Amino acid sequence: MTHQTHAYHMVNPSPWPLTGALSALLMTSGLTMWFHFNSMTLLMIGLTTNMLTMYQWWRDVIRESTFQGHHTPAVQKGLRYGMILFIISEVLFFTGFFWAFYHSSLAPTPELGGCWPPTGIHPLNPLEVPLLNTSVLLASGVSITWAHHSLMEGDRKHMLQALFITITLGVYFTLLQASEYYEAPFTISDGVYGSTFFVATGFHGLHVIIGSTFLIVCFFRQLKFHFTSNHHFGFEAAAWYWHFVDVVWLFLYVSIYWWGS
């Protein structure tokens, strides 16, 4: 690395892609074992291996960027393109769920009673918990933007305050969603309405948990002075992801909760 004549980071050999692939194999096999034989042993081994791989791989990335200085502007540009493509892939992922919902709701079959919501389904009131959830996520979008601007201006105190507020709102959203699921008058097995509702909102909830975890890591990194006003792609990626989660929820709220009810 001493005599490098280019701006790109030549990554050292790493075991983490191999252990990541192994953990994916164990998790998918473990799911099958759980579904068919009611044994969670293989699934737990897979999840543990996956968590350890993620922790150690991202630990290496933080060391290479923050402490060894390998993330030059050219490398950061590549990471930005990578994050943008990842978010686009997530948009297409959710497009499939919206497609399933609109396919079923715009032309309900005779089996559904020829109406939407299907006969016997009592949808949730969009002006109760779903509206509160919308307010919570919109507020978190404001606070993450406040945190980003504070970071760019070198205002460490306000950045930490705003980031903490965002994380708190993310956790609050998750708790509200869990209580809504617990009290819902229908289940995932209640036909196409139940399956599209719980799969779409459930995967969004999973993304909120992932985004909250991402932001918690950024919070602790900021406490350790890892970010500067012009070198903070880890936080920027988390902010982009959080805005994506916000926008997806708005589409979910308008489509499934409001129009779909």
Curated annotation (Swiss-Prot):
Component of the cytochrome c oxidase (complex IV, CIV), a multisubunit enzyme composed of 14 subunits. The complex is composed of a catalytic core of 3 subunits MT-CO1, MT-CO2 and MT-CO3, encoded in the mitochondrial DNA, and 11 supernumerary subunits COX4I1 (or COX4I2), COX5A, COX5B, COX6A2 (or COX6A1), COX6B1 (or COX6B2), COX6C, COX7A1 (or COX7A2), COX7B, COX7C, COX8B and NDUFA4, which are encoded in the nuclear genome. This is Cytochrome c oxidase subunit 3. The chain crosses the membrane at residues 16-34, 41-66, 73-105, 129-152, 156-183, 191-223, 233-256. SUPFAM superfamilies: Cytochrome c oxidase subunit III-like. The keyword Plastid does not apply. Belongs to the cytochrome c oxidase subunit 3 family. Gene3D superfamilies: 1.10.287.70, Cytochrome c oxidase, subunit III, four-helix bundle (1.20.120.80). The keyword Translocase applies. GO terms for biological process: mitochondrial electron transport, cytochrome c to oxygen; respiratory chain complex IV assembly. CDD domains: Cyt_c_Oxidase_III (cd01665). Its EC number is 7.1.1.9. Residues 1-15, 67-72, 153-155, 224-232 are mitochondrial matrix. It catalyses: 4 Fe(II)-[cytochrome c] + O2 + 8 H(+)(in) = 4 Fe(III)-[cytochrome c] + 2 H2O + 4 H(+)(out). It comes from the Eukaryota. GO terms for cellular component: mitochondrial inner membrane; mitochondrion; respiratory chain complex IV.
